[in-house]
């Protein structure tokens, strides 16, 4: 296929014996002219509606059609469009990225020839804001295509602008793979994650209708399932078990948070149908597996830890047990919903990187496969092309590292809001894989490449994704392979080094302040669980809700995560408040020590065992030992008496604090007032003694004054008597 004679007229063959760039005769023969000068800015936008075929062959016809839109404020006259193409194929993937980012600058234009025979007149005068349709068609045999590879392709718009000259008024570049049937194909593993934002409260109420709408016809998850169901042998299923669980919940009827209240959702039937279709699609994939598949009677589905937990952030905050719980419970939840065993648990690292501590924890909890970015484990030799499998070392042994190709995942994340964007994304994806197939040498230990999104919450355009999957196995440079196929390879075939996990990766995690709030709710749950005689069926729903609050999804929507944490905390506090002390008012002790009666109520539907303690304010004025092992049946009250000693004569404010069996505070304390009659009697004696003292002083004073008055009167009488 590298010989031009296979695709151009015989009288042109001689012209292409020498390279295109130095063959001016060849340019004339093809009706091609050098690239036109580029204006200061593009004024006409090119919107592509169609580009066929995906992989052109000799005798095919290349067709490109679309619209031209005048985005300027002036009229563009004599508008035409024509096709341009590079003289030689791209040889490196970096060139694809470079070409995609280039401006329409003639000094750096990668397009060498513009084919005049493709020129079509579009509009005599394209007014501002107006659009006009165009279609370019050319036999593939007439294209100046040389050796196999990816060629830069361009639709150039010409017209008369303000300067009065025919100049380039706009254009769009894309890629044209030109690969022979004897191409050395790569094996493409398509990872197909199904997950969504787990915004479900502990009581099952949804914070919003995002998931029900996504499961309904036309929704994101509905589209992903439809595409996968059409390509059961080409994709590798991965799902968050929480999504399967919530889909089942929705199918059984659901409520949605609506301000302070709730409303009944009406998309239950759609959720049930989605689950049924998923089961059928998984059965189809299982039926197409090779007879010697290791999956046995398991579904060809791997699951992430429950709610796609952000293991890095959670581990950093010391909540290791939550990571272990979300990992170990994942497969059983999925199997329960799907009524059949699944093919194990893996961890899809948010952001594509994993620190050593988190890797060790995952390995210790039974995870044997992690999904990372390619540069998380780059080849030790910089000249080696990275393929799809490596080994991630941990303290507990090596884990399979599935390495998603960064170029492909970045391409899948390109804008796809229009048909034109979808086509450009599709062509770039095909270009990336075609160049890869040429770069991987025959002696490489692997030709498997992993394609997948940058995160599990992807939202691709269905049409373009369908076309890409259709191309896998039909274009000559792409064969399909499964994740199971990949995992049978030697994961140490390419020597690798471990990439870093630096400040940028840490900053992308759930924030430490957020995880601290989650930790606070976990402590609430631990306290509540401690007093329940039988926590089964109550605390597990809160434990799952707390795991949902630790999802990596909240990296993308932190406000929704905060709302979920708050709702769980409020609901849990309401449960805690159903076990409480009824005591209030003033209690008088018959002496400085006495018994304080306390009534404890249990409004829960199951028995609890608590302790209780009196605490004075200030504490130094009250001496009291806690009382433990108080069991209260559901819906009942129990009265107990606590011995207490009040120090001092004033009324003492005290709290009646319930305790967990291990002595931790439970709930909020009730407030009472304590006073002692012993101090009241003492005060009365003091007052009586003081009164008697005062009376004595008064009597003595009066007596003294009377005596003094009498003495003075006698003295005066003696002075007035005559001397004899």
Q: Where would I find each of the regions flagged by the language model?
A:
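Intrinsically disordered, low-complexity Pro/Gly/Ser/Thr-rich segments with frequent PxxP/GP/PP motifs
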Residues: 104-145, 622-648
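Active-site beta->alpha N-cap acidic-glycine motif
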Residues: 165-292
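Short aromatic-acidic-glycine turn motif
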Residues: 85-110, 616-627, 662-665
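Short beta-strand elements of extracellular/lumenal beta-sandwich folds
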Residues: 58-74, 592-602
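Proline/serine/threonine-rich low-complexity linkers at boundaries of modular beta-sandwich domains
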Residues: 34-46, 569-578
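Catalytic grooves of carbohydrate-active enzymes
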Residues: 226-229, 235, 335-338, 353-378, ...
